[in-house]
Structure formats: structure tokens, C-alpha cells
Amino acid sequence: MAQGPSCASELHYYRALDHANAGFATGTYHLKDDLHLATPPPHPSEAPVVNPNPLATVPTPPTSGVKLSLVSVGQRNKLPVFTSKEKVTAPPFADGNPALAAIPTKDGLKRRKPKNNIIKSSSSFVSRVITHEASSKRLNDRNPDGLFAFANINRAFQWLDLSSKNKEEPLAKILFTKAHMLTHDINELTKSSSHIDIAMGSSAGDIIWYEPISQKYARINKNGVVSNSPVTHIKWIPGSENMFMAAHANGQLVVYDKEKEDALFTPEISNHSAEAMKASSRLPLQVLKSVNSRNQKTNPVALWKLANQKISQFAFSPDQRHLAVVLEDGSLRVMDYLKEEVLDIFRSYYGGLICVCWSPDGKYIVTGGQDDLVTIWSFPERKIVARCQGHNSWVSTVAFDPWRCDERTYRFGSVGDDCRLLLWDFSVGMLHRPRAHQASARQRTSMIASNTQHFNRHRADSASNRMRSDSQRTADTYNDYDSAVRHPVEPRARTALLPPIMSKIVGDDPICWLGFQEDSIMTSSLEGHIRTWDRPREGINDSYNGNTSSPAISTSAAGSGSGIADSAMGSL
């Protein structure tokens, strides 16, 4: 395992919630692995860049660094009870549209696979596929509870076995011709020891449905026939075997079905008057094709336009009804995606928002952005809870640690272009607004609550309007749809500030992904470093069984937030 020369050898975090009787055990995270994936060179058909000029205006393919997806096909330890999905009561997406009802086939319950063999592919989109010579033996001999990792890095996509002694040797590696893979996701519902469904989005707008065990694939949105813009984020819709959602750089959210063919997309509002079209374009969500449409023979299943700027990321809520979307225009938009409507719009302090996630119980949304801040939003109260200051550059990923969350206290992490990994603990009781503004804050909260009740009634009325046929819609009808609550930016002086419990530089290049496992924390970077830190083990001191030379991140009690892990962070 290649270990980065300046990678943090230890991660120390400090308990910042002692005064609130919250927080979790302190300890040391020891660096277990530092796996380096090589960045593939440009395809030979591309003209080489002889003298790269940082001021050049020539467009280059967008990149996203290394993004990981982890999956275990065995009975690996499940998520904590706190993240249980037993409370999900929302109906499945597209439920009630007979045009999208599953059609029985002669295959019965057998999982369908893509039709094309990617190894033998003659497509100009795929350059080359390299498989491990002993991949079949490795798959048969491995522990089914071990982790597979799928990683995209520029025009390469790799399949790794993290439970193998030779984890640096991929089971398969796909090289695409010119397009860069920017995002991908695994369908947790359909995974098994013989089948894994992966959707990946490219800088060309094309989407690949890939099944790695059979090495079969299908190409969706070929040549941008539905949306000709790079795919910035992609996720399988919770509870669906076939449908996934893709965010495009042109501000569109598109729902695709892996089983459907593509067709040239024409907006289903094109037969409306110019006045109605103009009114529709001003909505926070312009429905260009509804999931309730009976025209469902081809992709897309649904297509929504949110803005004219890039959608950075989105996240599904644990209740499988709501969607949090962050955009380059600096907005956080919370949707009821089952009803196809925007409920609330929040704004960053300044600059675009880059990343978003939900707390395991669905009560909080956390965002990170170009203002170098991490922000906590309360979903039930529809307001900002705290701004988290600690990064020195753009925040690229935020994620909750489900093994360190309970009913009272939450832990999440963030990484960014400043090469830092930060950990944060918070509970509602520890967050206090400045006293001078508490009265006005209560007044604003009551106003928002009353407005929310008004808009909830308005949403019920506008929902009934959706029963009208498309030909009956007028400009006034579209204006009636705009029931989103637009929240003003809360001044920094009125917002609680939360310090991190740990801040550490963990590499030399920007960190672009963060993931939590029961026994470890993982990060990946722009230049291909995948690092794994073992969690502190209860009852074992910081000597880590006597091996004090092991690289690590360490945590120790430091009173009520007075000790911050990295003094170079500055005043919080």
C-alpha cells in the first residue's frame, strides 16, 4: 500500500460537548491504508496539452477527483437502529401511474442485466476494459461480507475488492475514450452475490448502466438525446429497482428507467401559450415532463428544470419523500419529489453550494459550499441552526456518521479543497444564538411558522389544480403553483457558530469524498488517494497495541470545546 509522505499519521479529535453531557468517547484514528489510484492520461485521440496555461479559455472536460461507492453483498453489519427505515410511510415514487406499473415477464423475479458485453464492446465511447486474470477465483474465494469499492477517476472507472490482500489490483478497470466519469451510485435494493446495478454519469451527459459481475452494460441518454449536459450527480431512487435520478449541469433533474429506451425529448408544455411558458420558467421547479404523464414508453420518466445554473448535488431524505438539492446559484431547495413541488428555498451566506446530506433521522440537513462554511438547517422548523466554521477553502463533501448519532447528539464530517478532514458534534441544547437577537429570532420563527401553515393550505389547493389537463393551464395556473417559501439569509451575527471537534490536514491534494463505516473513516482525494482510518477501539489506549509508529488521527478530552485539534484553524 503506497502511503502518502505527508498524510496525517494520526487524527486527534476533542470532545467539545462535555458541558452538555453529550459527545462520544475520545481516542485515536489510526491510518490503516493509503491506496493510490493512478490518474489515466488523456486518450491518444486527444491533442496533448504541450504548455498548460492556467489562464487559457479552452474548455477542458470537468473532473471530480475520486468518488467512491462501497457495497457488501453479504450480511455485513447493518446500520444502527437510529437509522432504521421502519418509519418510512411514503408511497413508492410513481405509485399510482399505471403507465409505470411493472409488467410481468417470463423471467419472473430474475434480475435483468444490461444486454451489451463491455469487454467486447465496439462502441467508440468505451476505449478499453482491463480485467484481472484471476478475477473469477478472487470472487469465489473472497469473504462475502467484505467491501467492494467502485471508484471513478477522470476517464477511468475501477472495481476494487477492499477485503483482498491485493486490493490495489482492480478486479476490472474501464477506460472511456474522452468522457470523464463524474459520479456513480449502487442500487442497494437489487444487490446480491451475483448481481450489482451501477449507474454512472459522465461529462458528456451519457449515462452507463453497468453490471460488473457479468461485465454487461447499457448506454442511456446516448449523445445527450434527453439532456445534453454533464451529469453532476446520480442516485438510485429509494425503493426502486429500475429508476434513478440524475442532476445535469444545465439545472435539470431527470428521472431515467434503466429498462427503457431513449427518445428525443420534447417538453410536454410546448403546446402552451407563450405567456404560460414564460410564467412556468419563473417557477422554482419547472415540470417539463411529469412523473404522472401517461407517455412513459421511453426515457425520461420525469424531467424538472430548477435553474439555469449547475445542480451540484442532491440527497434523498430517510422518509423517502423529500429531496434536498444544492445549486451553484447558492440555493438549497427542499422538494417533495413525490408531488413534484419545491417546499422551501434557503440561501448560502455567499457563493454556490456544493454538497448536501440528511441526518439519519431526517431532522437536519447539512450543506457545504464556496463560502468555506458548513451549515446546519432544521427541516421541521424550516430554519438555519448553525454555521460551522473551520475550513479554509471550498467544502466538497459532508456526511453524517450514523454510528455516532443518537436522539440527543449528532456527529458529521466534512472535507474540502483545503485538504482537511473535520469532525463536528452538535446537539440542539448546546447551540445558543447571541442574546441580543433572541427576541427577534423568536418573532421571525413565529412568522415563518404562520407562513408555513398558510402555504401548506395553499399547497393542498394547488395540488388539486394538477388534476387539470395540460391544455387548460394558463399563466395564472402556473403562478398558483409557486408555493415555495423563500427564506431570507440569516445574518451571521444572529446565527450560532459551531467549532469542530477535530481538524486535520490529511493529504497534499484536495479531498473530494468522505465515508463512514462501523470500524473506520474513509476519504478520497483529487489525485487518487483512498485513505482508511481505523476507529478508536474501546478499552485500548493510544499506543494501539504498542504500535506507536502507526499513522493515526487522535482524540482526547479537552473540556467544553476549548481544545481544537489544529491551532492553525484560527479563531472560531
Swiss-Prot record:
Keyword Repeat annotated: yes
Q: Name one Pfam family in it.
A: WD40
Give the Low complexity compositional bias ranges.
549-572
List, alphabetically, the Gene3D superfamilies matched. Answer: YVTN repeat-like/Quinoprotein amine dehydrogenase
Q: What GO terms fall under cellular component here?
A: cell division site; cell tip; nucleus
Which UniProt keyword terms apply here?
Repeat, Transcription, Transcription regulation, Ubl conjugation pathway, WD repeat
Q: Where are the WD repeats?
A: 226-266, 306-347, 348-387, 390-434, 506-543
Residues covered by region (Disordered): 36-61, 458-486, 541-572
Q: State the source organism's domain of life.
A: Eukaryota
Q: Give the function comment from the record.
A: Component of the regulatory network controlling carbon source utilization through ubiquitination and deubiquitination involving creA, creB, creC, creD and acrB. Required to prevent the proteolysis of the CreB deubiquitinating enzyme in the absence of carbon catabolite repression. CreB deubiquitinating enzyme stabilized in a complex with the CreC leads to the expression of genes such as those in the proline and quinate pathways.
Subunit comment for this entry?
Interacts with creB.
Q: What is this protein called?
A: Probable catabolite repression protein creC
